[in-house]
Amino acid sequence: MHDLKWSKSEKKLARNVFNACLQVELVEMVNTFKSRAAAATTADDVWAMEEFLTQKRREIDGKYDFRYSQLLVVFGRLVREGRLREDELHGFSSDKQSFILRIASL
């Protein structure tokens, strides 16, 4: 199922959806960091921020994989997490939408 062919319009939509979801997650991470930094009063608070950033980087790098062979799984996960809505999948083939929604339901 991962070897489905991607049309030119699907590739463009995939890139736009991927970038939009990634950008939202990065903005959330930056805002959380700013809040924690503003509240930091001890060295332990600073080290905790470093741990937070390291963990978020691993999480985001592992989640956002723009290989076409992985995108359906990536989008399924984003739907499951509430970062991508089902109506944002319109424009992908029905096979791709079905696969994404199956992944989201796991």
Write out the residue ranges for each language-model feature.
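Acidic, Ser/Pro/Thr-rich low-complexity regulatory regions
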Residues: 1-106
